Amino acid sequence: MVDTHGQPLKLGYKASAEQFAPGKLADFAVQAEEQGLDSVWISDHFQPWRHVDGHAPSALVWLPWVAAKTSRVQLGTSVLTPTLRYNPAVIAQAFATLGCLAPGRAILGIGTGEALNETAVGVTFPETRERFARLREAVRLIKQLWSEERVTFEGEYYNLHDATVYDRPEQPVPIYVAAGGPGVTKYAGRAGDGYICTSGKGMDLYSETLLPALREGLEASGRTEGQIDRTIEIKLSFDEDPAQALENTRFWAPLSLTAEQKSSVHDPIEMARLADELPIEQVAKRWIVSSDPTEVAAAVQGYVDAGFTHLVFHAPGQDQSRFLTQFSADVVPLLRP
């Protein structure tokens, strides 16, 4: 299968960092490479969506560990916030190092953040306008550190004085910008090497709002769609047992809360309480829930037809090894005939 612009379709695996301990999560990443997938992605939460049975390993530590255990897959954050609890200069240094250790494989996926991960460490969580402004400034700062020898930077939020990132990879680390609305999506088209969004919000959002906004940004920067990787995290609960496929979505009920709740609630205990009030039918709406490989492939095709070039699959169940085995055997051949 190729995308609508003739590019080979990439298939990736989203490591469920809020659900599994880091060692087990790394084993799943290794299996994803062994099963022939192209990329592995991890979020960078300080706190999980759920307090009970939740996990939140550091992406900055986990990614180099997985890089050492794999040899081929691209490794990225989906996503990391480089603007609040981190100084963007530290992120520039960390991902330059990762790019040296895993040449051509590292991806810095970034977003504007969630209160869940910032408030707990004493960081004031700003309004959307400021978070977006911080993100734009951080990208400028990171790119300067990656391209210039000595950087003095005077911004509204960040400052550098004679700063140098001494270890930089020969192949620059691409920056992917995550967005769920047209404003930041347009910015991704102007400034990003890639774009990230998530599935399950109605196909019209992607075909009529987000991807057109991305194209506007690309046109403003003098680029074409073929010059940006259009990535979507596809929420897929696939299991041979239909009842199990449905039940597996329950752990990830917080994803079905409103955007305002997900961005503003700072306590995993409260997040889980709100999520557990949702009926399973509402939770499952964010997911492709199926035991039929053909049905899955047909649902996924809609995102390819819309214009996405990189499909990253996030499975909600506890048995991730089972998912990877079944998905690779039954679904991938339909996506890569």
Curated annotation (Swiss-Prot):
GO biological process: carbohydrate metabolic process
Enzyme Commission number, as recorded: 1.1.98.2
Oxidoreductase recorded as keyword: yes
InterPro entries given in the database record: F420-dep_G6P_DH, F420-G6PD/mer, F420_G6P_DH-rel, Luciferase-like_dom, Luciferase-like_sf
Active site: 45 (proton donor), 114 (proton acceptor)
Pfam families: Bac_luciferase
Binding site for coenzyme F420-(gamma-Glu)n: 44, 81, 112-113, 117, 180-181, 183-184
GO molecular function, one term: glucose-6-phosphate dehydrogenase (coenzyme F420) activity
Catalytic activity: oxidized coenzyme F420-(gamma-L-Glu)(n) + D-glucose 6-phosphate + H(+) = 6-phospho-D-glucono-1,5-lactone + reduced coenzyme F420-(gamma-L-Glu)(n)
Keywords in alphabetical order: Carbohydrate metabolism, Oxidoreductase
Binding site for substrate: 198, 201, 262, 286
Signal peptide positions (record): none
Top-level EC class: oxidoreductase
TM stretches of this protein: none
Function of the molecule: Catalyzes the coenzyme F420-dependent oxidation of glucose 6-phosphate (G6P) to 6-phosphogluconolactone.
Family listed: Belongs to the F420-dependent glucose-6-phosphate dehydrogenase family.
Quaternary structure, from the entry: Homodimer.
Protein name: F420-dependent glucose-6-phosphate dehydrogenase
UniProt source species: Kineococcus radiotolerans (strain ATCC BAA-149 / DSM 14245 / SRS30216)
The gene coding this protein: fgd
